[in-house]
């Protein structure tokens, strides 16, 4: 259950200690007011994700205030999905976690966390490394709360010199580094499906990236089509065309 991990943390430059996200206010330590930066440190962790289902189901039998129980369930999280490997023109592989592998044909870009370790290995391959390094430094001074705020302006830097390869279409797609992707969540890399995720749609619109409809319905020229059930019909998706989302998900695994 317990293990050690090298991970990105909030580091107070004055207290010389790790801070929880709640202890970082507007980029400074709530206790001393000093600047907080991101550092990679060895931390003791609990493997909560391996017990997510048990922990969430166990909350139903506890005499908790409903609000507290809901907060606990949201914090633990329950997610059923798959890891997908994307090749790159650098010869490396990027792994993402997704609950919607049926939308792979609609992936038009990828995004890496500024702390993703693969970026350092690509330093000599990226023609705009100085821009990437400057963006990473800027992100290091933001809290995870600031970075993951849904309504914040989307920022990022496109990597010049390395592309990813969509495993479904075999086409090269651009890779960005953006601070809304956190190294502490998932693999630190996400796939962009702008036709069916609103945050991806906003990012793609800002950077002029293709938006492909792979689940029929809605008007993706105006916003992402985010049908919540699994009855949608697949389009522009090769062998998945005509299937429902429900049937397409297991067909892609």
Where are these regions (language model features)?
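Alpha-helix boundary/capping residues
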Residues: 59-62, 111, 125-126, 139
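Short acidic-glycine loop/turn motifs at beta-strand connectors
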Residues: 88-91, 114, 167-168
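Residue patterns forming the tRNA-binding/recognition surfaces of aminoacyl-tRNA synthetases
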Residues: 1-94, 101-102, 189-253
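Short glycine-rich loop/turn motifs
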Residues: 79-83, 107-108, 159-161
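Short hydrophobic-aromatic micro-motifs
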Residues: 46-47, 95-97, 104-113, 173-177, ...
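Short, solvent-exposed loop/turn segments at secondary-structure junctions
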Residues: 102-103, 117
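Short acidic, gly/pro-rich beta-turn/loop elements at beta-sheet edges
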Residues: 106, 185, 245
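Catalytic alpha/beta core of large soluble enzyme barrels
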Residues: 116-223
């Amino acid at each position: 259950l317990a293990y050690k991990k090298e991970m990105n943390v909030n580091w107070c430059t004055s207290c010389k200690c790790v801070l929880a996200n709640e202890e970082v206010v507007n980029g400074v330590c709530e206790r001393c007011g000093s600047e907080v930066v991101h550092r990679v440190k060895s931390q003791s962790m609990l493997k909560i994700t391996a017990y997510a289902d048990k922990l969430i189901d166990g909350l139903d039998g506890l005499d908790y205030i409903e609000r507290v129980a809901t907060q606990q369930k949201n914090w633990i999280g329950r997610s059923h999905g798959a890891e997908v490997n994307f090749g790159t023109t650098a010869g490396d592989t990027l792994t993402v976690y997704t609950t919607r592998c049926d939308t792979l044909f609609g992936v038009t870009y990828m995004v890496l966390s500024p702390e993703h370790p693969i970026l350092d290995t690509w330093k000599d391959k990226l023609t705009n490394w100085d821009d990437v390094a400057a963006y990473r430094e800027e992100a290091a001074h933001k809290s995870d709360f600031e970075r993951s705020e849904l309504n914040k302006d989307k920022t990022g830097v496109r990597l010049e010199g390395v592309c990813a390869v969509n495993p479904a279409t075999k086409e090269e797609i651009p890779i960005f580094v953006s601070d809304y992707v956190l190294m502490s969540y998932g693999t630190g890399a996400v796939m962009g499906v702008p036709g069916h995720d609103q945050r991806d749609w906003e990012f793609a619109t800002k950077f002029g990236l293709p938006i492909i409809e792979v689940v029929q319905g809605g008007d993706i020229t105006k916003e992402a089509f985010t049908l919540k059930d699994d009855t949608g019909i697949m389009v522009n998706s090769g062998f998945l065309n005509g299937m429902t989302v429900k049937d397409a998900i297991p067909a892609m695994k």
